[in-house]
Amino acid sequence: MKKITPFFITLLLLFISQTITSQSIVINEVVASNSTINQDEDGSYQDWIEIRNNGTTAVNLNNFGLSDDPVLPFKWTFPNISIGAGQYLLIWCSDKDRAVAGSPLHTNYKLSSAGETITITSEAGVTLNTVTTPAMLQNISYGRIPNGTGSFMFFNAVTPAAANGTVPYTEALSPP
C-alpha cells in the first residue's frame, strides 16, 4: 500500500474545509415580479435573488452556480468575489449576464412569477441550497423567517441585501 503524502492530506483538508464553509450559503429572499421596489444600476426594475452567508467566515463564491434550471446547476456562475460572515449579496435576475467582481451582478436569465426552483451550487458541484418559489405577486418577496435559517414566507416590505422583515404572511393574495 502506498503512503499518503502530506501534500495529498493538505489538499483533502482544504477541500473538506471549503465544502463545509460553503454550506453556510443560503438563498434568503427572492422577488420574481419587481415593478416598483428597487432599480438596478441601469434604472430598470428587475427581479432578484438575495443570498446570505450564515457562517462565521467569509466564503469565496468564485465559480459557484446559480440557476433556475435543475438540469443546469451552473447556468450562471459567480465571479471571484467573497461574501463575508453574516453578510448578504443581491443578484439581479435580469438576463443581462454581468459577472464582474465589484460591480452589480446580473444573471443570464429572468425569474418566472409563476414559480420555479432556484439552486445555488458550490464550485465542486455540491448543491448548497434549493428553494421552490410559488406563484408571486408584484413587489412581494418570498424570504426566510427567522432570517437566514427559517421557513419561507411572503413579505410586503421587501429587504434587498438586508435582514428580512418581521411581519411575514403565509400567503399572498391578489388585490380585490
Question: What annotation goes with each model-predicted range?
Answer:
Residues 1-9:
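Bacterial N-terminal signal peptides that target proteins for export
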Residues 16-17:
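N-terminal signal peptide c-region/cleavage motif recognized by signal peptidases
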Residues 20-176:
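Intrinsically disordered, low-complexity linkers and terminal tails enriched in Ser/Thr/Pro/Gly
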